[in-house]
Amino acid sequence: MLRISNKIRFYCKIAAKSDLKSKLDFTQLRHPTKVPQQPEPNAFPDLDNNTDDDPIDSKTIQLLERLSLVDLDSEEALKTLKSSIQFANRIVDIPTENVPALYTVLEKQQLQLRNDSVTEGNCRQEILRNAKITDEDYFVSPPGNIPLEQQNE
Amino acid sequence: MRRHLQFGIKQVHSSYLDGRLSPHLVTEQAVKDALSLRTLNAFIRLTPELALLQAKESEERFQEKQPKSELDGIPIAVKDNFCTANVPTTCASRMLQDFVPPYNATVVSRLRQAGTVLLGKTNLDQFAMGAGTVDSIYGPTKNIWSEDLSKDKWRIAGGSSGGSASAVAAGLCYAAIGSDTGGSTRNPASYCGVVGLKPTYGLVSRHGLIPLVNSMDVPGIFARSVNDCVKVLNVIAGPDSKDSTTIRQPFRKLQLPEVDQINLRSISIGIPKEYHCLGLSPEVLATWTKIADILECAGAKVEQVSLPHTAASIFVYSILNQCEVASNMARYDGIEYGHRALDERSTEQLYATTRAEGFNQVVKTRILTGNFLLLRKNYQKYFEKALRVRRLIAEDFSKVFETNNQAVDILLTPTTLTEAPLFRDFSALSNRDQCAVQDFCTQPANMAGIPAVSIPVRLSQNGLPLSLQLMSKSLNEQLLLTVARWIEAQVSFECLESGQLQAAEQ
């Protein structure tokens, strides 16, 4: 058996090089190129300077925090949120009359269905193993039906 | 005498068969190399005991002349957003830092059935949200091609599957699994100088891949050659009863012709003009131009085509990504699995604190933005609108691939706009801008569900890989990879030639 050593890699490089075809010359072309040599004009001019129209008030932020159950905890995050919304605004003027929404690229194929019967299971211990707190065979949560406390009213 | 050991999986396999190499020895070496190149931070977790055990089993199979497949005994790495039974799967997040799945993702179990050796779990941007592998709680992954790996002078590996790309580029494993939602496999493949395949949506099962954007996610493959990539695809592709979104028709294993048997005369290559966008580097442009030229020299029909909605795609992608993220991330509440905060005031309070502690700023902002875009008053304006424009983008592709007399077979474009950026330049941008720039050429394929592959072509002035992307129509992997293989043979890019690797070997 051959000993694998780091030298093999080195050897392979030499081996690969010895029969290397002449390196391509990237400045020489034989045909008029079909690749555009100038950038296509940008159909979506940069709107980032246009930060005046504030799309989001503090009530909306509170709603988003409740829906998301994450906190918008800094000025930086708020700035990112606003700029992401502006980013999304770039497509609102594209004409899409009579264009149906594309929910899935597999829309032409039927979704696979299976019989409604148990095929696997008996893995309670394995499932519960990943919970931080369990009680007998139950997951445990603190009291429900209490609204989230929100600061910055 | 050692010529057969040029690192192709095929050659390793035949060396296993005739006993010149053994899976155990190769795996031992891979573990050793991975440890000596720890500075790359390609792995979140190495699994040496498991790998050596699997290698030993593989070795026994070879001794009995009964290997399970051509991949038997081949060390492979898997991105840490694929579930691996009894091996922690973290998504590089605090939320899943202690999560130990009780089951294997289908991709992982198929690789196991083929006898591969799992070397470890690779690094990524938290929950795969990024284009640099810089937003991981385990720290960023470095690119083996960096001129200098110290301080902040190193190059990013790209993302979000940067760990997998880096591991393959550094020769630590023969192939690796990543995921690709908007370019997360092709982008790091491009920067790290390896082959990166995003298969047709639905060709490879996503069961056990922790979801990011369900309507676009696909498992991706990294390898050092197109041939190796095909071998992995042949093992993992095909219908899966555990993923109802897999394509139901049986998968026919790909078999690529030898390079000298490839005839390009009947093949039509399209150059979509919109892919020359602002910010494309002159070196990438020259690479794109030259490869189009050599294809034409070889007899392929090369023509310029237009995909008019390309520029809109990045905005649509951003909207759909954030909306699906907002929905997908709702599952993390701290009760059943994952991080749980010490806050027992109320259920909602527990959820909120858990999520505040478990997610980074990028994840939180995408959730908040997604929920804004999905508000009742915004749903039509943004979400529905984005889905309509998505159809226009997908139709652009079907027009160029299917218009009767002018149909093209393959589209040739850049993968990334530049060589791998320096970490310090990249991290100065916001996550949104990082992705908006880096995903320009890659995310349209995810919108349309079509297959795409990034292949390395040459080195830049700075000695960094420059790559190009090929795309084709759905389920046309055979032709896509045949053309990729042909280009690969013309350019003779050497995946393992990086200076850092040579330094590590001395």
Curated annotation (Swiss-Prot), chain A:
- Cite the entry's keywords alphabetically: ATP-binding, Ligase, Mitochondrion, Nucleotide-binding, Protein biosynthesis
Task: List, alphabetically, the SUPFAM superfamilies matched.
Answer: Glu-tRNAGln amidotransferase C subunit
Q: Which GO terms describe its cellular component?
A: glutamyl-tRNA(Gln) amidotransferase complex; mitochondrion
Question: What does the record give as EC number?
Answer: 6.3.5.-
Compartments reported by the entry: Mitochondrion
Q: Does the keyword ATP-binding apply?
A: yes
Q: What class of enzyme is it?
A: ligase
**Region Disordered: start-end pairs:** 31-55
Q: Name one GO biological process term.
A: mitochondrial translation
Any extra remark in the record? Answer: This protein may be expected to contain an N-terminal transit peptide but none has been predicted.
Report the protein's function.
Allows the formation of correctly charged Gln-tRNA(Gln) through the transamidation of misacylated Glu-tRNA(Gln) in the mitochondria. The reaction takes place in the presence of glutamine and ATP through an activated gamma-phospho-Glu-tRNA(Gln).
Family, as annotated: Belongs to the GatC family.
**Protein name stated in the entry:** Glutamyl-tRNA(Gln) amidotransferase subunit C, mitochondrial
Species in which this protein is naturally found: Drosophila willistoni
